[in-house]
Structures are given as structure tokens and as C-alpha cells.
Amino acid sequence: MASGILVNVKEEVTCPICLELLTQPLSLDCGHSFCQACLTANHKKSMLDKGESSCPVCRISYQPENIRPNRHVANIVEKLREVKLSPEGQKVDHCAHHGEKLLLFCQEDGKVICWLCERSQEHRGHHTFLTEEVAREYQVKLQAALEMLRQKQQEAEELEADIREEKASWKTQIQYDKTNVLADFEQLRDILDWEESNELQNLEKEEEDILKSLTKSETEMVQQTQSVRELISDLERRLQGSVMELLQGVDGVIKRMENVTLKKPETFPKNQRRVFRAPDLKGMLEVFRELTDVRRYWVDVTVAPNNISCAVISEDMRQVSSPKPQIIYGARGTRYQTFMNFNYCTGILGSQSITSGKHYWEVDVSKKSAWILGVCAGFQPDAMCNIEKNENYQPKYGYWVIGLEEGVKCSAFQDGSFHTPSAPFIVPLSVIICPDRVGVFLDYEACTVSFFNITNHGSLIYKFSHCSFSQPVFPYLNPRKCGVPMTLCSPSS
């Protein structure tokens, strides 16, 4: 009955315009009351439409100066706001064990209890509070948690959309790559069948691995989003329900909320991928044919030991390495390591003297950070150890060689310029893949020396033309200061 009376009172103090409890109520001469903001907006609209102000309920005209604040109604509204009108607000739950009202909250157990529960063994010694005292505190916490989770939900949905876009992009990209590979290899089918198969397998493996990982990430993102949605629904239900529903198990909900972390999906940078490209198919075909042709002249090369070179030679005369550095003791017993005259004292010739014809051999330089190789004419070992650095490595002195420094700098040595004739002209060589194995082809009659990168499908590294072979020439190897050996490969390898 009391509830019905309160409902009737609420209707009397409800604004006819916004249908909410009156805020700063103003009354007209006709007796109707409105919110100050609502009446002000209605007055402006009436003046624009009709040129006069009238009551929104009974349409009786009024003068703005006759409007008066209704403090009596304002007091009624204030009292009414303190009373809960909903059936849930008037409802008092009772303890299932004792039948008493549930008016206490146990902090340790996170439960709503009655006064008899408080005195029971289960809750004895626990910290208990009136539900009304702690409800507001937890409501603020849960409201903040709700806002945070809504933000995380938005972030999760954005991550989910990003991963789907990433997945589609990768699928399109790899499909595009596969199409290009197929088109490229169509023109090189006779020679490059194995290359095509290898590249497609790599792409398919890459597609499988990446899409598998992205699919897994997508599933995790969906589960992550769903988990956040479920927690949000739980919080909304608690916030909209009764005090008991708000507080029952609230600590567990807060712990779940605090443990919510958004895991970002794994992505794969496209700019770091290695994808097969064949920009010059005709040139590639010529390279393959040239390498196939010169390998018909493969000769079995070994080195020739001498008393001048300090290079270390294997028993089968195929492997050459630099010796260990000498230890020199200076003043006060200081120890120094030295590689005196290493550039030329570690150089050594092949045993074969070449005076005509075509000759090809290969040298394994894998894992070496420095080396020099090629051909040498008119070798004079007595003079070599007296020349420092790279000054002797010039065609005019009988050297047609290329070399590697610091593991990445590949160069060819040409004759010095007019201004610096004693120093060789260093030609930087652009190699996409640093060679682990180098092929050397000497055409005595054509006066050419060519170098091939066997590691990169036999591509041409450099070619010396118009060579002056006025005397016999020999294969030349120099392991330099790098302790890793260089090996002459047999034709059967």
C-alpha cells in the first residue's frame, strides 16, 4: 500500500515534458510545474513559433515574470529520491539457513549473510559490514571495471579485425607470389624445373606456417573477445540487480576482472621475406647455359708446394690455409701477434701450368671471411714477400684475381690509374649472395678469365677481358689471414 502511495506521489512531481522527477521545479499561474531547463526550452520554442508563451499542458498563456520556483515540490522530490520505488528495491532477501534478513556482508567470504550467520562458526572472527555500507564502494569498483572492460572489448575487437585483415593480406600476397613464380618458371622449364618445385614448396610451407599461426591467433582473439563479453555481461547483471546479487561472490568477479589481459596476435613483417625473383629471364638462361658449357672443361687442380709460401697445405694438395700468427716478444716481455707479409707469403700456385686451351676449376671458400683467388702468370716467388698489402694484384703484374674482405666486401683487382700506378684499382662487386663456392674459367686463346658464383645458381661475378698471357699461367689461391681453409674441388664433387 505504501508503495502505491509513493508511486502516486512520484506522478505528481514528474515533469510533463521530460517525464523525469522535477529538477529545479518552476510553477506557472495555471498550477502546472516543470523542470527549469524544460520550461526554458519550451518558452524559446513557443516564442519562435507563436510569439507568446503558453503552458505545455493546458495551453494557457503566461507571462515569464510570473514564473516562480516551487520549493515545496523541490523538497518532495528530494525526499522521494531517497526512497526506492522499484519492487526489487523494496524486497528484503532472507537467509536460507536461518530465515533472517540478509543485512550483513562478510569480507573474508565475499557473501551476504544474516546476523545469525555472523555468529556461526563459519563466519566467527570475520570482518562484517552492513550491506548498504559496502554496496556503494563495490558499485564504484565494478563501474570502473565495466568501463575498463568496455575499452578492452573495443581493443579486442580491433585486434580481431586486424588479424583477419592480416590473414587475408597474407593469403593474397602469397597467392600473388605463387602466380609470379609459376609465370617465371614457365620460360625456364627445361633447365629450372627443380628450382620451380623448390620455390613453390617454400612458399606453400610459408603459407601453411603463417596461415596456421594466424588462424591460431584468430581463434585466440575470438575466445579473448568472447571472454571479455561474458565478464561484461556478468558485471552488467550485477550492477542492474539487487544488492545481494551485486555482492554475492564479488571478490571472485573482481579477481577475474583484474586478470583480464589482452594478448596481441603474432604478425609477420613482409619486408623481411625472401621471395624468388627473376627480373632478367633471358640473362638467367644465358648464365645457366654458360656455366653448363664451361663445366665441360673442368680440370683436376692441386697446389704445388714451394719453399717461399708459408701457407699450410693438406696431404692431398687440395686444401690451403694460413699458418698461425707468429709470437714476438717486445720490451718488458710484452707479447705481440704478427702476420708479416701475409698477403703474399700465404699465396700459392696450382701445380698445372696452362699455356693453351680452356680450363675450369672450382674453389670452396665457405665460412671464410677473407680470400683471394684467380690466375697468376710468370710467378716470381722470390719477389712476393717483399711487396706489402695488395700492390702486386694487378693484371700488368700478371694477376687476374678477385677477393673477399671482412666477410662481405667482394672486389676485383684491376690496373692502377695514371695518377696511382702502383696501387691496384679496386672494383667493388655487387653480389646478392656471398659465394661459398667460386668457379674459375680460363680461356687462354680468348684472353679471358671469368668467375662464377656457384652458390647463386652460377651467376657471373666478374670477367677479365683482353688479358695478356705472354707466358704460362697458373691457378692462384691465397687464404689471407683467415684461418679457415680454402679447398680445390674435384670434378666429381
UniProtKB/Swiss-Prot annotation:
Q: Where is the B30.2/SPRY domain?
A: 281-493
The B box-type zinc-finger regions cover: 90-132
* Entry-linked Pfam families: SPRY, zf-B_box, zf-RING_UBOX
Q: Name one GO cellular component term.
A: cytoplasm
Q: Which parts of the sequence are RING-type zinc fingers?
A: 15-59
Gene3D superfamilies (UniProt xref): 2.60.120.920, Classic Zinc Finger (3.30.160.60), Zinc/RING finger domain, C3HC4 (zinc finger) (3.30.40.10)
First-listed, main subcellular location of the protein, grouped into a coarse class: cytoplasm
Which residues hold Zn(2+)? C95, H98, C117, H123
Protein modification: Degraded in a proteasome-independent fashion in the absence of viral infection but in a proteasome-dependent fashion following exposure to restriction sensitive virus.
Pathway the protein takes part in:
Protein modification; protein ubiquitination
Location in the cell: Cytoplasm; Nucleus
From the UniProt entry, list the residue stretches annotated as the region Required for interaction with GABARAP and for autophagy. 185-198
Q: What is its EC number?
A: 2.3.2.27
EC class, as a word, reads transferase
Q: Which family does the entry's similarity section mention?
A: Belongs to the TRIM/RBCC family.
Please describe the quaternary structure of this protein.
Can form homodimers and homotrimers. In addition to lower-order dimerization, also exhibits a higher-order multimerization and both low- and high-order multimerizations are essential for its restriction activity. Interacts with BTBD1 and BTBD2. Interacts with PSMC4, PSMC5, PSMD7 and HSPA8/HSC70. Interacts (via B30.2/SPRY domain) with HSPA1A/B. Interacts with PSMC2, MAP3K7/TAK1, TAB2 and TAB3. Interacts with SQSTM1. Interacts with TRIM6 and TRIM34. Interacts with ULK1 (phosphorylated form), GABARAP, GABARAPL1, GABARAPL2, MAP1LC3A, MAP1LC3C and BECN1.
**Under which name does UniProt file this protein?**
Tripartite motif-containing protein 5
Organism from which the protein derives: Pan troglodytes (Chimpanzee)
Q: Which gene encodes it?
A: TRIM5
